[in-house]
Amino acid sequence: MAVISVKPRRREKILQEVKNSSVYQTVFDSGTTQMQIPKYENKPFKPPRRVGSNKYTQLKPTATAVTTAPISKAKVTVNLKRSISAGPTLNLAKKPNNLSSNENTRYFTIMYRKPTTKKHKTWSGDGYATLKASSDKLCFYNEAGKFLGSSMLPSDSDSLFETLFKAGSNEVQLDYELKENAEIRSAKEALSQNMGNPSPPTTSTTETVPSTKNDGGKYQMPLSQLFSLNTVKRFKSVTKQTNEHMTTVPKTSQNSKAKKYYPVFDVNKIDNPIVMNKNAAAEVDVIVDPLLGKFLRPHQREGVKFMYDCLMGLARPTIENPDIDCTTKSLVLENDSDISGCLLADDMGLGKTLMSITLIWTLIRQTPFASKVSCSQSGIPLTGLCKKILVVCPVTLIGNWKREFGKWLNLSRIGVLTLSSRNSPDMDKMAVRNFLKVQRTYQVLIIGYEKLLSVSEELEKNKHLIDMLVCDEGHRLKNGASKILNTLKSLDIRRKLLLTGTPIQNDLNEFFTIIDFINPGILGSFASFKRRFIIPITRARDTANRYNEELLEKGEERSKEMIEITKRFILRRTNAILEKYLPPKTDIILFCKPYSQQILAFKDILQGARLDFGQLTFSSSLGLITLLKKVCNSPGLVGSDPYYKSHIKDTQSQDSYSRSLNSGKLKVLMTLLEGIRKGTKEKVVVVSNYTQTLDIIENLMNMAGMSHCRLDGSIPAKQRDSIVTSFNRNPAIFGFLLSAKSGGVGLNLVGASRLILFDNDWNPSVDLQAMSRIHRDGQKKPCFIYRLVTTGCIDEKILQRQLMKNSLSQKFLGDSEMRNKESSNDDLFNKEDLKDLFSVHTDTKSNTHDLICSCDGLGEEIEYPETNQQQNTVELRKRSTTTWTSALDLQKKMNEAATNDDAKKSQYIRQCLVHYKHIDPARQDELFDEVITDSFTELKDSITFAFVKPGEICLREQ
């Protein structure tokens, strides 16, 4: 029991001090003043235990007893006769802030957040944790070195990284332990930044009592200190208190100028970094996350930087040497107020999706204007320029987009929302509403073009929250009257990115619609655009004005002017740059001999149609063209054709060919499929533009016992992704039947290395999209592309038109390798060509080869000499502009013009077939493909001619 000896005259003063103390109480009973103090029992000391911990913190005394001493004027001696057992000690020092390098200290990385009841929790920040060998306490710091709190180790050491620790007002979890010297050094540097700042006090911190130990082991202290409250003073911050969040940058101009900002990534610690360009107002560099940057190829690095410049409204830089890599340097550029969107028109397979994801991730995490967002204490922006991004794409690509986000970023880093096909309309609207209003859960919404219309009302209400729009397969927006396009316009999203492989073929009206959506007003109104560009360019391309020098020069001038405007925000590269990254690809065009039933069907249809070539136009003859294309595939498709039923149903020979399923192309197809199945271990994709044709092919494959799957317009959207995945992963599936128009866009079918294009489409982009399904990133095997064409029929005319139709697209989208002024100025197939379109050449091995070459087809690559075609054309122009011409001279000029046109067509087709070998199977039995060569005996009578463009290596096994 502790006894206090006090003189009588000081009793009242002491009692007054005791009365004011919260530790002791003064009780007055029966008019007698008596002080009662706690009684100390002589038993082992039991230290306090933290809730949730099984470890005790014990006190180690410096003396076992305190004896009584006379009280001086300023001091009082306390004799606490208490026996304290020896044992583990409690460290009563302040929170650990000693961050010096200690070999016995372990370092960890951590993730922390505020406690939340959300279903999908996210971490708000990263930091470090330290653990000294002599301590059981983890100390937590944020990435700037600020102390967050501490927590005791769990009893089970195996659950160290699964335990959710409580540190101050945060939940903390260990990520991994730092082992590398460089990592430990970086952690020490980060923690040493705040060494001078005292750690925040906690309720468990106790103030130590200063004492002087005399010979008797006594503690002497002031009397007032003995009975006063033992409290901790509130920590007074050295910074001025504000009502704003401590990490928010002060908004006063004076503080903003004094604040120094730093990029999210240190450019000095990244190998070959990608540093974005900026304007003069930028406060910090934007550097592409090395997590993605290390996977980007050179053309993709340039693409990401180009798109960033466009969306940030930066003018195009002047690059003196395009071969020099400028992606590692940040250029200060002028602002371009006309531009806020970009059209990425790269060929299929160049990685447009990866480039887009890289741009999205960069804008979500970083911004060049750090003073406008919340920053850490060290001046690093905590949020990016964009918070909500809308991705609109065909429904077949929704799953692919989400997989790509997961592949490159991991969905734990970025929140990606897709609307389930099982949702009701109300559920979709609620999901979109929550996406826009809840900030941290999702950053990207991927939605199909059709679904966009059903949730347009919710998007319209909160359109100010959408920071960026991405439209995949953006050429779908070329129709100005489209509801989808008008819905997207109503959202008024400033930053827009359109992705497409073929944005334009031969229609400047569609081109204007797309460009005006990306950057509104950059081409003026449609009326002014039509007056300044469409009319002059169209007149220059009209064959009736081909010799009018004035019109041609004006058209060329307007074309150059348009190119100068659009190249500021359009990027177009061909897939030729992929040759060094992908396996070799062999292109084979096979001309298949038509069956006699097909020839009979052609004659009956053309006679029954009673064509008037004087009034014939392409639009009016479209039904007949479709019917003739079906005959090329199989005569059995004729009976169900609408045009045939309404115009030619009374022909005498209808039954002789309408019941026949055989055709030259079907014979070659089934022989190829059998050769691929028996001679290789590869898979094959068969593409057609008609589901009826796919039905016939599917029946033939079933009869041959060939396992396959099919994707066309009748397949529900929710099943398409699983069909593609099953084909790519299941080795038991041999074939994939694909509808070019319904499923040929954006699909990744790298499980197959051979593709057969059974029929052609007027639009070359449809066929190019379909053929690029297998030769793309992820393909490991050499690829073979087969195009089947019926000899001498409409199939060949379509092929010839396809070879030339890209001229306008190449001109305005910058395919420099194929750019040719003459090819861009002329429509190679005018109305007169329709007459030839409906003719059947039965006496030729290949009408296309007859147009361009007279070789013997021995498999040699033909070198074409440069022609004087342009000079001849200019001469004809000059001669045609004279004031008067006789009838004889006029007839002569017309004949020369016709000859000149034929020569031009031949020249352009030759240019498109450069590097192709010309093979006549009757003279040469090596077609540079083991499957065709091994099946040559069966195919010799079915293949009349072939164009082959071999890959880099010969796959023929010796």
Curated annotation (Swiss-Prot):
- Name the gene for this chain: RDH54
Occurrences of domain Helicase C-terminal (ranges)? 665-824
Q: What class of enzyme is it?
A: hydrolase
Subunit description: Interacts with RAD51 and DMC1.
Q: What does this protein do?
A: Involved in the recombinational repair of double-strand breaks (DSB) in DNA during mitosis and meiosis. Has DNA dependent ATPase activity. Promotes D-loop (displacement loop) formation with RAD51 recombinase. Modifies the topology of double-stranded DNA during the D-loop reaction to facilitate the invasion of the homologous duplex molecule by the initiating single-stranded DNA substrate. Required for adaptation from G2/M checkpoint arrest induced by a double strand break, by participating in monitoring the extent of single-stranded DNA produced by resection of DNA ends.
What Pfam families is this protein classified in? Answer: Helicase_C, SNF2-rel_dom
Bias class Low complexity marks the residues at 202-212
Q: Supply any other comment.
A: Present with 1270 molecules/cell in log phase SD medium.
- Keyword Metal-binding, does the record have it? no
User: What Enzyme Commission number does this protein have?
Assistant: 3.6.4.12
Q: Where is this motif: DEGH box?
A: 506-509
Q: Name one GO cellular component term.
A: nucleus
Q: Name one GO biological process term.
A: double-strand break repair via homologous recombination
Record's superkingdom?
Answer: Eukaryota
The protein here is known as DNA repair and recombination protein RDH54
Family annotation (SMART domains): DEXDc (SM00487), HELICc (SM00490)
The record's family statement is: Belongs to the SNF2/RAD54 helicase family.
The record's subcellular locations are: Nucleus
Residues engaged in binding ATP: 380-387
